[in-house]
Amino acid sequence: MNSGNAKLIKEIKKWRKIMKYKLIATDMDGTLLNDEHLISEGNIEAIKEIQKKGVKFVLASGRPSFAMFEYAKELEMVRYGGYVLAFNGGQLIDMKDGKMIFHEGLDWDDIRKIYELSCEIEIPMALYGEDTVYASKDTENTRFEAKLCGMKFREFGSLEELDGYGIKETTKCMLISDPEKVKKAEEHMKSKYGNEYFIAISKPIFLEIANKNINKGKTLRQLGELTGIGMEEMIAVGDSYNDIPLLEVVGMPVAVSNANEEIKAKSKFESTSNNDDALKTVIENFFR
């Protein structure tokens, strides 16, 4: 525990006595995963241990579900009945039986509007098929997204071409560029479509656009209703702007030490960094 958390020792002991947490939901990139996009052995063992004790574990990411399953299997979430909350809440999957509990996304008209705006501000748009990332421009950053997700990559030059690939809907779209352009794109997108979509920067080069009725927090709340676990009985861990809805709905919001300041301001506890067993630190502080 870092010095900034030292003053919270007494509070943690009090929280342990008052509340028995039954679920942990964590972001992946920048939180659970280290900078090599791996789960540390310390995190793996700690997460398996609490699942053995009956605590439910949820992977909550902006990633497509396709890019989350291997991590879920590594954590034995199939065995223990964990959940994958993908696309920032656009999909919720029960790993025990592989069933899709919830899905909500963007239709063709949404895709068209976002694509036209991306052309207007000259920033590539990407969206997701079943196993392929489709991007309006082949760049290092758009290919990086496909590589990060373990998906195929295909460039499209027009909506007609995209339609030809059989894409009629998607769970989310992304505008992908350098951080300065992405920040400007966020401002432009929110000024034009802020009331129509959920818009958030997940990583400096990624602006995510999804159905306005979804975010990580709303979908986690649905999971709480399904399982009978109260929101006050949940811990959530995150590092970036798309994690804010997640942190706002749980009893114990946690930021990793590498999180931005806005995320830290939303948290009650600061864990170690994503490169220093952040989830293990959370588990040691709230379950032992």
Where is each model-derived feature located?
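Active-site metal-binding loops of divalent metal-dependent hydrolases
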Residues: 28, 63, 238-240
